[in-house]
A protein has these predicted regions:
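Terminal-proximal interaction/regulatory segments of ATP-powered molecular machines
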Residues: 316-413
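Walker A/P-loop nucleotide-binding motif
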Residues: 57-80
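AAA+ ATPase "lid" subdomain C-terminal helix
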Residues: 249-255, 263-276, 313-318, 333-335, ...
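Conserved C-terminal helix/linker of AAA+ ATPases
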Residues: 268-291
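Short alpha-helical segments that sit at the start of domains
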Residues: 291-311, 315-319
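Conserved catalytic segments around the Walker B and adjacent sensor/switch elements
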Residues: 61-63, 86-102
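Mid-core helix/loop region of P-loop NTP-binding domains shared across ATPases and GTPases
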Residues: 3-21, 28, 59, 102-222, ...
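A short, basic N-terminal segment
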Residues: 1-59, 411-413
């Protein structure tokens, strides 16, 4: 049977099988529903904060904290969408720019995106960061607007490149005469203030808003509302809905995970030709998502977090100390030509890798020698090879044999 015939069968079976979905896009992360259950207080507080722009006044900067999947981005986009409509109604000269800092990846690209949002064309490379910022500032001032900048996952960029770009943005109003800027910073890390210059933090966090995790009951309500829009009537079983809610609640109340579980469970049922989505389909979806989650986490790590993880990989020990990891990390930075972080900063990155489930970092007592942290991989070495081996920057480092690894573990790598 030729490939064309195989595909004909696949497509015809899909079209003729039981239809589970009305609209699967409703279960995607970027879908903003008409209602955001259990976030009414946050919507009101953010709305009150940004409302002054409707009277051509600059609103306060605000920092929004919360773990992944707690509704930070959805609430921000929801509020600003409604604010945009009101601004047009009242004739207020307001403009917004949303930037995901993890996806953007550098200060240059942040300033380039801001420049483009006020009508400037910026080359992909070739200018200094300072030159791009100056062009943005000049173009913005000529626009005569109130400009609200949303920096989502700003913690990722600050940890990778420092907070110099944030310092420039928080002081920009001092040099503008015709426009005004307000900043909404969104962070997954509640400890971000530890990485910020106190002057930057005080300017940025004029207002603060913390999003607590959803509980199982709230997640169930969210999924129930979305399921009415996404699935055909009678397709989703009550047990499948409950297990999705419970699993996501166990993962710090992550609504994104709950939505992913529900969508993938529906797709599993769809491929099997099942008429209903059951708990077993959710269990299969969980396994599939977990693998993809780890791959995505590895791909999205910052440069130095990848180097730290590779250092643990090369040690290949049941448990390693921070000092041993730092020795390997030092070598890998040299091979890549990258700047070196301090051992204390490396310890912070180890803690972040631990919180992501990529390594296990446990403090153990060494008796009269005090306490030390023992670190080991929590994911398979083959998965690290597969993911990092596909990145030109890291493929050679995977095969590299660090001298410190030979010294520490007798030649095992």
């Amino acid at each position: 049977m030729g490939n064309s015939s195989v595909l004909d069968d696949v497509f015809e079976n899909f079209v003729n099988s039981a239809k589970q979905f009305k609209d699967r896009e409703v279960l995607r992360h970027d879908y903003i529903p008409e209602k955001l259950p259990h976030r009414e207080d946050q919507i009101r507080l953010l709305g009150v904060t940004v409302a002054p722009v409707l009277r051509d006044s600059r609103c306060s900067n605000i920092f929004i904290y919360g773990k992944t999947g707690t509704g930070k981005t959805a609430v921000t986009k929801y509020v600003l969408s409604h604010l945009e409509s009101k601004a047009k109604e009242y004739g207020a000269q307001v403009k917004f720019c949303y930037i995901n800092c993890r996806m953007t990846g550098s200060e240059y690209r942040v300033f380039a995106a801001l420049s483009q949002s006020v009508g400037l064309s910026i080359p992909f490379t070739g200018l200094s960061v300072g030159e791009v910022f100056d062009r943005f500032r000049s173009g913005l001032d000529q626009s005569r607007i109130i400009f609200i900048i949303v920096l989502d996952e700003v913690d990722a960029l600050i940890k990778e490149h420092g907070d110099a770009f944030m310092y420039e943005l928080t002081r920009i109003n001092e040099t503008l005469t015709k426009s005004k800027v307000a900043i909404i910073g969104i962070s997954n890390d509640l400890r971000l203030k530890e990485f910020l210059d106190p002057r930057v933090f005080s300017s940025l966090s004029e207002e603060e808003l913390v999003f607590r995790p959803y509980d199982a009951g709230e997640l169930r309500n969210i999924l129930l509302e979305r399921s009415k829009l996404s699935f055909q009537d009678g397709v989703l079983t009550d047990s499948a809905l409950s297990i999705c809610s419970a699993l996501a609640a166990a993962e710090h109340g992550d609504a994104r995970r709950a939505l992913d579980l529900l969508r993938v469970a529906g797709e599993v049922a769809e491929r099997l030709g099942a008429k209903t989505i059951t708990e077993e389909h959710v269990r299969q979806a969980e396994k599939h998502i977990e693998h993809n989650r780890v791959v995505e986490a590895l791909n999205n790590l910052t440069l130095h977090s990848k180097l730290v993880l590779l250092s643990v990989y090369h040690l290949n020990k049941p448990s390693a100390t921070t000092g041993e990891i730092y020795d390997i990390y030092n070598e890998l930075c040299g091979e890549m030509g990258s700047g070196l972080l301090t051992q204390r900063r490396l310890g912070t990155l180890v803690n972040e890798l631990d919180s992501m489930g990529l390594v296990n970092a446990k403090v153990v007592s060494m008796g009269r020698y005090g306490r030390t942290k023992k670190i080991r991989l929590e994911i398979s070495r083959s998965l690290i090879r597969d993911v990092f081996g596909g990145d030109n920057r890291f493929s050679q480092l995977i095969e590299y044999s660090p001298q410190a690894a030979h010294k520490k573990v007798g030649g095992t790598a």
